[in-house]
Structure formats: structure tokens, C-alpha cells
Amino acid sequence: GSGSGKSAYGEKRILEAGEMTRYYIATMEVFGEEGRKKVERHKMLRQGKGFITIESPKDVGRVEKLEKTGNGKLTVLLECVSNLTANEMFGSSFGAELEPGRRTEALAEKICADIAKIDEAADFFAVITNEVGSDGEMYEKETLEYIRLLGLVNCRLAKMASEVVEVVYGIPVMKKGAEV
């Protein structure tokens, strides 16, 4: 969830990957003062760590600025899939001609294909996401469809990943892969 330490853990993993060109792909669209403060806080926390920031709230597969410098290797931190998914679902006309359930499937495929393009380019790739909808609350139809879409994307990304780590109150809990 929000404030769980996911970002700090992802950054730590990128830094541990060694001396490589470091990219941070930021997907958050800033709305209001709270959003601006969150972005500023994250920028401050990344300061001095050598990240090149690319703002890409949608269509992350079109990110073409990933250049390998130095030793010819690069790492990428993508933050955050939950924002990316919301931006693609609510701020894009992709699949608008499809009925809602089919659009959700098409969006999940698109988002995962876009992320796979980054994975192919990177020597080390960390993806930050959220799990939403497990609180048992009742939601509007559109929100339920977003929760379903994010769940599909997260499941597919977990299948693609060599490691899956849940960060709970700053504590990494290995779900898939080698021990942390």
C-alpha cells in the first residue's frame, strides 16, 4: 500500500545491481497539491543516486530514451503500475470501441507488452505496483473494473518476473524467486 516502503526497496535493489545507467520511469500524473508533494518527496529521496527520470504516465512501451552509457548496461525502475494502469484505463481511448470486459483484457495485454519492451532493454528491471481491492469495500462499477485490470496486470507481471517481493511496513517478503 501507500507508504509501505516499496519505492525505497525498489531503489535499493537498483543500486545493488551495480554501476549501470539508472533510469526511473515515473507514471504518476500529478493532480493537486498532495500529488505534487508526493512527487517532490520521491525526487528528493532519489537525489544523488544517479537516476535519469523519464515522465511517462501512459504508453511506457514507447520510451525510447533508454541509452546505455558507461559500461553499456542499464537498470530501470518503473513506478508505479497502479498509476500507469489508471492512466491507461481512464485517460486513454485505447480499446474504447470494445465492451468493458474485453477492453480490460486488451488493456492488460497492452500494459504488459509495454512493460515487456522495457524489460527487454534493461539489464536489471524493478517494477513497483500496488495491490488494491482486498479491503472488502463495495465500489462503483468503474472502480471494480480498474481493480480487476490491475489484478490481471499484476498476475501477468508476476508470471514474467524472476522475483516478486511484497513490501510490508518496509519489510521485504519474498513471494517468488531467490531469497532477499
PLM features per residue range, with description:
Residues 1-68:
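Conserved P-loop
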Residues 19, 46-48, 71, 120-122, ...:
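Short, well-ordered coil/turn elements that cap or connect secondary structure elements
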Residues 3, 29, 82, 132-136, ...:
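Short, glycine/serine-rich, charged loops/turns that create anion-binding
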Residues 21, 73-75, 124-126:
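Residue-level preference for the first positions of well-ordered beta-strands
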Residues 10, 42, 77, 130, ...:
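Residue-level signal for inorganic ion chemistry
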Residues 49-106:
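Helix-adjacent hinge/juxtasegments
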